[in-house]
């Protein structure tokens, strides 16, 4: 996932990962073993999957990007019978497991890396990057409305809310009004066209380490792909399919998604269902206990070797024998934004 209010001090496109981030910490928290079944819900370039397979565990690897799945076929041949690739949203990882292993099957671990794949960023035709000219697309699959659809069809107020909440863009209102005025004369269809229009509007301080369009591009991508909703549903799905003692490991890169993961594990620790405003109703048995203390970050050596790891945080939990808690998306405090399926029909 792109920058969501985390460490924006990195270079442009800093959310992109070219090498597996926190790989040693992921394996230590996940503890894969020979014969175990691990779900890699965000296959991407396959960095985590390869390392898990090397421990002797089997992997069900999920990615909604057909290009990533196709690229993974070579790894599938390298580990015959031990890697199953599934083209799917990671929010439906429970359905993917049922498809591969049978209904009701549980797994030993789930790992999620909430970062955009370098393969997607590096391909100009995918339209993720303002550093390369390409169609204003940003979809992780070929389905649904594109970023161009959002930019050219959404109301000004909705665009401003998307830029503000999903990108924490301080010029959200100004940029949205500029887009409304410009698109009436000429719709936005190319990445550099939008990036240049934003830079012309807000200017660029020579001291800034990121491009003025960074936060707008991140917000559009998160919106078009429903990345926050995907993360929320994936956490709930992982809770349903993990065996007692199974481990959920999540790597995030920015503060908004890290807060979602932190809130999930805190809620799943159980306790009273009441609050300081309402009387206690019942005690909720924990569905997860901590696998690590708080959030784990990169070592100084990894930061030196891979600056993109600088803002990475790992959180992990161990599934208890208790049943899943309430399957309620309101836990995550997701913003009310226009539905993308409505956008497609507009």
Curated annotation (Swiss-Prot):
Name of the gene this protein is made from: rsmH
HAMAP family in alphabetical order: 16SrRNA_methyltr_H
Coiled-coil segments: none
Gene Ontology, cellular component aspect: cytoplasm
Lineage: Bacteria, Pseudomonadati, Pseudomonadota, Alphaproteobacteria, Hyphomicrobiales
Catalytically driven reaction(s): cytidine(1402) in 16S rRNA + S-adenosyl-L-methionine = N(4)-methylcytidine(1402) in 16S rRNA + S-adenosyl-L-homocysteine + H(+)
InterPro entries per record: RsmH, SAM-dep_MeTrfase_MraW_recog, SAM-dependent_MTases_sf
Pfam families documented for this protein: Methyltransf_5 (PF01795)
Source organism (scientific name): Brucella canis (strain ATCC 23365 / NCTC 10854 / RM-666)
Residue sites binding S-adenosyl-L-methionine per the record: 46-48, 63, 90, 113, 120
Superkingdom of origin: Bacteria
One example GO MF annotation: rRNA (cytosine-N4-)-methyltransferase activity
Protein name, UniProt field: Ribosomal RNA small subunit methyltransferase H
Keywords: Cytoplasm, Methyltransferase, rRNA processing, S-adenosyl-L-methionine, Transferase
Localization of this protein: Cytoplasm
Keyword S-adenosyl-L-methionine in annotation: yes
Family designation: Belongs to the methyltransferase superfamily. RsmH family.
């Amino acid at each position: 996932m792109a920058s969501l209010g985390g460490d924006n001090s990195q270079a442009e496109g800093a959310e992109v990962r070219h090498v597996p981030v926190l790989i040693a910490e992921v394996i230590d928290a996940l503890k894969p073993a020979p014969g175990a079944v691990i779900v890699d819900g965000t296959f991407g370039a396959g960095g985590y999957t390869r390392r898990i397979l090397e421990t002797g565990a089997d992997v069900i690897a999920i990615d909604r990007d057909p290009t990533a799945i196709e690229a993974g076929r070579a790894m599938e041949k390298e580990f015959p019978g031990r890697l199953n690739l599934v083209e799917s949203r990671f929010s439906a990882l429970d359905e993917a497991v049922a498809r591969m292993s049978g209904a009701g099957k549980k797994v030993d671990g789930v790992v999620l890396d909430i970062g955009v794949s370098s393969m997607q960023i590096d391909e100009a035709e995918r339209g993720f990057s303002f550093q390369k000219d390409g169609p204003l697309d940003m979809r992780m699959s070929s389905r649904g409305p594109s970023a161009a659809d959002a930019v050219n069809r959404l109301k000004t107020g909705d665009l401003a809310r998307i830029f503000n909440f999903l990108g924490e863009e301080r010029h959200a209102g100004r940029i949205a009004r500029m887009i409304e005025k410009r698109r009436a004369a000429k719709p936005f269809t190319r990445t550099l066209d939008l990036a240049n229009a934003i830079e012309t509007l807000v200017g660029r301080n020579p001291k800034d380490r990121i491009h003025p369009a960074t936060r707008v591009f991140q917000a559009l991508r998160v919106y078009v792909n429903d990345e926050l909703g995907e993360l929320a549903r994936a956490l709930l799905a992982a809770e349903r399919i993990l065996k007692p003692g199974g481990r959920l490991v999540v790597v995030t890169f920015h503060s908004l998604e890290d807060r979602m993961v932190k809130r999930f594990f805190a809620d799943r620790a159980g306790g009273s269902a009441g609050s300081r405003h309402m009387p206690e109703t019942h005690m909720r048995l924990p569905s997860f206990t901590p696998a690590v203390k708080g959030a784990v970050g990169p070592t100084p050596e990894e930061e030196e070797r891979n600056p993109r790891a600088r803002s990475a945080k790992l959180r992990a939990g161990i599934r208890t024998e208790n049943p899943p808690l309430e399957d309620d998306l309101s836990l995550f405090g997701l913003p009310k934004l226009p539905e993308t399926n409505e956008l497609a029909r507009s």
